[in-house]
Amino acid sequence: MTLSADVAGAEKGPAKGGRRRPPRTPKGRQLDTAAVQEVQALLTDKPRRRDLLIEHLHLVQDHYGHLSAAHLAALAAEMKMALTEVYEVATFYSHFDVVKDGNPPPPVTVRVCDSLSCAMAGAEKLLKDLPGKLGQNVRVVHAPCMGACDHAPVCAVGHVQTFKATPESVAAAVKSNPHAHAWDKHTGLAAYQKAGGYTLLKDCLSGKRSRDDVIKIVSDAGLRGLGGAGFPTGRKWSLVRAEPAPRMFAVNADEGEPGTFKDRFYLERDPHRFLEGMLIAAWVVEAPETYIYIRDEYPEIRLMLLDEIERIETAGLSPHTKLHLRRGAGAYICGEESAMIESIEGKRGLPRPRPPYVAQVGLFGRPTLEQNVETLYWIRDIVEKGAEWVTAQGRHERKGFRSFSVSGRVKNPGVKLAPAGVTVRELIEEFSGGMADGHTFTGYLPGGASGGILPESMADLPLDFGTLEKYGCFVGSHAVVILSDKDDMKAVALNLMKFFEDESCGQCTPCRVGTEKAARLMENGPWNQELLIELSAAMRDASICGLGQAASNPLTCVLKYFPDELTKPLRTW
């Protein structure tokens, strides 16, 4: 047999030593020169720090409508990160479209909210009807709560939301090719200052007010964290202040609990009241840097805050803390305090084991104060008017006031500022115009998806921190969804379980597997009550964070309070 010269040479091998080494060739994905140049053009002179990874991914996603493999590799090279790290982060967040090269998604994406309030208003029918109405160049996908439950059903064309959506209104929105613009229906800096705004902050910075005095007023008023946990605010400030400097400050504007939209309500109307409270809190704990983490579903508010923060800085109102605005990317889990910190640092939003708590080891490894938007919104009023202004309000032996996000089967849904301890029956009749026509009140969610479900027979319980726990429920973020005789309680619990299944970060097995198994058991045939109870207990007792621990609350409440529903066929909307 005659060999070619190349093969013959190869067979001779090296004269001495081991086997011949193959010629060196590059391994792995090779950088695309054009993609590198495109990424560089988007980043310009922005820092290539790890904590800015999600911000940079947004730049590419916003410009091209997706994240290609070539752009991810180019971004990894620019930031001197492993491609696997960039890929893991990009694929963790639902608002990033990671695609193969040459396989981009349709140019327009329509997201249909199918969380409970929107499902009750016809989201399922929208998901069925829209693809045929919009055509092949539009992608229709389901999405979690968009923070506009009082306008259900809600769709987002790109990043612009359509309220009380119909196939016709969504088609018109697609045709108009909308783009998000800065929100402009709020009280601006000049008007806020004219009404006395930032006077308290100036008094704090000038020494007219002491940190201890401000903490005492806030503590005496009984202000608690209004994002869901309800931890006493003054105590939290004192705990963080006791930790060594430098301390950090992180603001949670990522309200993603289904049924919750009160932070959006206040930010759209009076953002500087929130910003002044935030700057006072930063002064109290002496935080040289403050990070605001806002959900991606609120693009108009994000753009508005960028403008207002620039005005604050120009006016010299924030000399004590550097302000950063960070953008979420569609992950409910980032509402959990440590997951949010991971996301601000440019990582996947995975909750951290505790201890240590974020007040001890938080953002960038430093002691960190973390607060919700509404908590900070009330700081100015409480300190200026005194603790008595708060404690003089309340009902049923509770003190203070609460902002309730009310949606579902009422005539007038919306944010209702009501006395702490108000009952859901009072909330419906006095604040929400009564039940919607043709609906009979049968049950309610007192605290969003996580807070459980209670029957109409328990509608006279005070709604406040600590009043519902013995019934297997809690008020959490005060998101109240009203249910009627038109709603199947099994379908309600299934909708919420599917939400948790979708939003589980996947880090721990009890939550990842438990939510999936529970959803399958709940949607297929008669409920296996014994197995569902056992599964719920495992999720509650062994999950790392509050998502898995609370995911079974609606399920267990239906088993406990609505036994007559269990024998009926599943009836969706």
What are these model-predicted stretches?
Residues 277-279, 420-436:
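Short amphipathic, charge-patterned alpha-helical segments
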Residues 236, 290, 433-448:
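Short loop-to-beta-strand transition segments
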Residues 302-420, 432:
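Hydrophobic alpha-helical positions that pack around
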Residues 16-110, 114-146, 150-180, 199-220, ...:
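Ferredoxin-type iron-sulfur electron-transfer modules in oxidoreductases and energy-metabolism complexes
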Residues 157-159, 407, 411-413, 446-447:
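Short strand-turn-strand beta-turns centered on an Asx-Gly dipeptide
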